[in-house]
Each structure stands twice: as structure tokens, then as C-alpha cells.
UniProtKB/Swiss-Prot annotation:
Function: Possible multifunctional protease. Efficiently cleaves 'bz-Phe-Arg-4-methylcoumaryl-7-amide', a kallikrein substrate, and weakly cleaves other substrates for kallikrein and trypsin. Cleaves synthetic peptides after arginine but not lysine residues.
Chain's gene name: KLK11
Gene Ontology terms: biological process: protein maturation; proteolysis
UniProt disease link: Ichthyosis with erythrokeratoderma: An autosomal dominant genodermatosis characterized by early-onset ichthyosiform erythroderma with excessive skin scaling and peeling, and erythematous hyperkeratotic plaques. Lesions are present at birth or appear soon after.
Name of the molecule in the record: Kallikrein-11
GO cellular component: extracellular exosome; extracellular space; Golgi apparatus; secretory granule
Propeptide: 51-53
Entry-linked PANTHER family: KALLIKREIN-11, KALLIKREIN-RELATED
UniProt-annotated catalytic positions: H94, D142, S235
């Protein structure tokens, strides 16, 4: 678990990749060596929870995903998220932090585009069934609501995505999006939002790919020949099918985009009642 947490905490900076540290922490050659060891161990395990990347996708048409949000901790991109109401975001529970800076309405994270909105958020509601003590071992109920301090203004560039209690079936074409790395195992972090078209696969094939790790609240998606996937770098982002939110990017295989090893998503249709009740009570 700890080694995967270290892998998740790597980030992008203007000079390349640096290891994220808690405020006040100091690095040392010994710590740097330990970080490298943990990363190599995490890669060796194969299964990776957390931050995802869009592999072999394409640059999204600017502002074509107006529900897409980016969760930052200060200047560090933590996860993706989906706007589902003026004050509410849906993301993965393993993205839990005490405070976020939320960026919406952006395509290029390094440019001011005139339509972006920024909010803070300190209230998070992970699903009560999520095992936060084992965030990279137990992937069940990997879903969380985040309440922003103030509502966003609904514009052409910032707009909520519809939820649906009707689950999609195998063969449905869907879209994933995020700002994570565009290659695996090497990390190449884009500035602009990336998209990929993928397809929902049969539940039995999903179980066969990850024996003992798949529940009925998870859904798998990929392309049959491999090559397109979500993986480390931007967890919590949306899986959009038929213009509704059907999945939250959760976990999968590393290296990513391997044939017969699809990405695994939290099946949002199974949680609509919990989402609505949590928003109503808070």
C-alpha cells in the first residue's frame, strides 16, 4: 500500500517530475533513493490504484467536456473530478485530501483562457463502504462527493453532467478524459485535456482479467486490441456514455493499455441513491 501511495504522489512541475512532499518536509539522498525503490516496487506489482492517464487518446476539442474538473493541492494536480451540481463534484474516494483548489472550465492548465472558474473545497464525503486504510488494495466503493465552498456559475464552459440510474451494457461506446500522462510506463504529462474513445466490456471478461478483484459496483472498459486506456496520473475523472456519467476512473494494470487488462471504473449507476441522499443531507 505504502509503495503505491508514493507512486501516486509523484507530480508534474515546470522542470519535470518531482516527488510531492508534505509541507515542511525536507528531502535527502537517502529519501530520494527510498522513493526510487518504492516506485520500482509499485511498478512490479502490476495493479495500480489512483491517478490515471489517457493512453493513445487525442486532445479533446477545447471545452467539449464542460463538466471536467481538476482537483489541486496548492499547485499540484491530484485528481480529476466531474461537476454534477453547482456546488458538487464526484470523484474517486482514494483522492481524499483535507482541502482542494478546484479548477473548472479549463482546457490548457498552463494558460488563462477567460472562461475558467476556481473554487475551494474543504468538505468531502467518501462512500462509507470505502476502506481508506487500504486504498490501493481494496478498490470497492471508490467514490466520493466533494462540496465546493461556493457554487459555480453555469456557462457554456462549465456545466454539470447528468447522472443515470440505468447502467450501460457491454458494447457501449464511451469517452474518458483527463490531464494525466499520455504514455506508460514512461511519464509524459500534457498541458491540455486528453480524451479517448473506449468500449464497455462484458462483466465476466472483467472478472477474468482481475480474478477476485471485481465487484458488481465496478465496470471495465477498453478497446479490444488494447492501446487506449486510463491509468496513473488523473484518477477520479469521468467515464461518459450516452451523455451521462457512468464511471469514475479508479484503477487498473500498470503498464497501462495492455490487451486483456482493461481499465476499471466505479459504476456510478449503482450509487445514484447514495449520491442524491448525501447531497440532500449536506
Amino acid at each position: 500500500m505504502q509503495r503505491l501511495r508514493w507512486l501516486r504522489d509523484w507530480k508534474s512541475s515546470g522542470r519535470g517530475l518531482t516527488a510531492a512532499k508534505e509541507p515542511g518536509a525536507r528531502s535527502s539522498p537517502l529519501q530520494a533513493m527510498r522513493i526510487l525503490q518504492l516506485i520500482l516496487l509499485a511498478l512490479a506489482t502490476g495493479l495500480v490504484g489512483g491517478e490515471t492517464r489517457i493512453i493513445k487518446g487525442f486532445e479533446c476539442k477545447p471545452h467539449s467536456q464542460p463538466w471536467q474538473a481538476a482537483l489541486f493541492e496548492k499547485t499540484r494536480l491530484l485528481c480529476g473530478a466531474t461537476l454534477i451540481a453547482p456546488r458538487w463534484l464526484l470523484t474517486a474516494a482514494h483522492c481524499l485530501k483535507p482541502r482542494y483548489i478546484v479548477h473548472l472550465g479549463q482546457h490548457n492548465l498552463q494558460k488563462e483562457e477567460g472562461c475558467e472558474q476556481t473554487r475551494t473545497a474543504t468538505e468531502s464525503f467518501p462512500h462509507p463502504g470505502f476502506n481508506n486504510s487500504l486504498p490501493n488494495k481494496d478498490h470497492r466503493n471508490d467514490i466520493m462527493l466533494v462540496k465546493m465552498a461556493s457554487p459555480v456559475s453555469i456557462t457554456w464552459a462549465v456545466r454539470p453532467l447528468t447522472l443515470s440510474s440505468r447502467c450501460v451494457t457491454a458494447g457501449t461506446s464511451c469517452l474518458i478524459s483527463g490531464w494525466g500522462s499520455t504514455s506508460s510506463p514512461q511519464l509524459r504529462l500534457p498541458h491540455t485535456l486528453r480524451c479517448a474513445n473506449i468500449t464497455i466490456i462484458e462483466h465476466q471478461k472483467c472478472e477474468n482479467a482481475y480474478p477476485g478483484n471485481i465487484t458488481d459496483t465496478m465496470v471495465c472498459a477498453s478497446v479490444q486490441e488494447g492501446g487506449k486506456d486510463s491509468c496513473q496520473g488523473d484518477s477520479g475523472g469521468p467515464l461518459v456514455c450516452n451523455q451521462s456519467l457512468q464511471g469514475i476512473i479508479s484503477w487498473g494494470q500498470d503498464p497501462c493499455a495492455i490487451t486483456r487488462k482493461p481499465g476499471v471504473y466505479t459504476k456510478v449507476c449503482k450509487y445514484v441513491d447514495w449520491i442524491q441522499e448525501t447531497m440532500k443531507n449536506n
